[in-house]
């Protein structure tokens, strides 16, 4: 089990200040129409202690201070909804999404959900128009 610390991540311009660097990946054809609510590259909480309702947001129990850069992410297909290309999920804080290319079909290019101090810089998004043939949940 990886233990993440909040000691790093104070300086987004210094890659050595991040706990995890996700770099130079080619992520493609993910989801393939069999699942929902996912990301090509996703950061998120490990459990209920990271639900944003406690002081645990920036403690080692949460996936924080991740630098996602220089990745190519393309073509994600959900079953019903929510194929997110770059996805910072619940309470994932202090992350930097930089110099990524997002291309093709999917739902949303970049999502920051309920975290603190997440940044997006210099990302290129090229989306093809795709018809939405699914019903929206109500």
For each predicted feature, which ranges?
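Extracytoplasmic/periplasmic beta-strand context in beta-sandwich domains
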Residues: 38-39, 84, 108-109
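Acidic/polar loop patches that form or flank catalytic/metal-binding clefts of enzymes
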Residues: 109-110, 131-135
């Amino acid at each position: 089990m990886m233990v993440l610390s909040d000691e790093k991540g104070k300086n987004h311009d210094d890659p050595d200040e991040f706990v995890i660097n996700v770099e130079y990946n080619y992520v493609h054809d993910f989801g393939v129409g069999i699942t929902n609510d996912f990301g090509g590259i996703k950061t998120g909480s490990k459990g209920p202690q990271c639900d944003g309702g406690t002081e645990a947001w920036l403690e080692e129990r949460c996936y924080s201070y991740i630098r996602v850069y220089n990745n190519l992410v393309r073509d994600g297909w959900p079953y019903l909804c929510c194929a997110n290309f770059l996805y910072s999920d619940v309470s994932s804080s202090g992350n930097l999404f930089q110099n990524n290319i997002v291309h093709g079909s999917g739902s949303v290019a970049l999502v920051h959900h309920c975290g603190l101090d997440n940044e997006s810089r210099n990302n290129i998004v090229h989306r093809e128009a795709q018809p939405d043939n699914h019903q929206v949940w109500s």
